[in-house]
Amino acid sequence: MTIIPDEALVVRGGRNLPEDIRRGIGTHPSGITGISVECAVGLSIAELASSIPHGQIGVTTVGEVRQAGGDVIRTSGRSANHATLRGLNPQQVSQLLTPTVLNPAKQQL
């Protein structure tokens, strides 16, 4: 398993309130339980958000997730940048991903 660098951006669509995070928790077919995110080094927020249908997104880094006690693991998904954020409770995840911003990928349409 490849370790994602701390400086990698982590992007998740939606309001990212604790109740939204709670509803989004699931177990990936690989066995990792957490929430789906887009994550990569060297891509812009807009590039990572391009596969996200929501009008708003939350943004953090892998390093911030790890400082809070969680991790981001590369998992298969709809895009090549899909990953699973795991190891944090919904409140902790929400604090990292709020306030949200407008999805720049949707603004370019």
Q: Can you name each region flagged by the protein language model?
A:
Residues M1-A8, N16-L109:
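Conserved NAD+-utilizing ADP-ribose enzyme module
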